[in-house]
């Protein structure tokens, strides 16, 4: 499987939804592999999260896809309140998990997905596109509360 072609096919699908996208080469980044970035809307008010999709070979027949969404780039004065809610949100979160990246005080959602590579790049991109929207729905559900708790009301 061609990882670059896979990310390019996924980018086309995201662009059809009018998401701003960018392919980022893995140069001195903590991510494994190249990254597809997209600004994904999470509500009718126009709020968006920064979504990073990274994919790299996990085995001969599978690809590990990480969907990392920065929901709040820098948590405000409600850091402790937001931190306390993480346990409740993660207990009921159907896919992935919410967390706080302490170094940047960033609130995120992360989902790792093991993808069998027995299809072509276009088929695999369509499958990941579906998973991205599942993750987006999970994020959209708690986004207003996360923003309010963080102190960014």
Report residues per predicted region.
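Short beta-strand micro-motifs enriched in acidic
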Residues: 24, 54-58, 101-103
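Short, aliphatic-rich beta-strand segments
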Residues: 107-111
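Long, continuous compositionally biased terminal/linker segments
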Residues: 36-75
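Charge-rich, low-complexity N-terminal segments
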Residues: 1-52
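Helix-rich interaction surfaces within compact, conserved domain-sized segments
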Residues: 136-139
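Short, highly charged C-terminal tails/helix-capping segments
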Residues: 144-153
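Short, internal acidic amphipathic alpha-helical interface segments
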Residues: 64-106
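A short acidic/glycine-rich loop-to-helix N-cap element
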Residues: 116-131
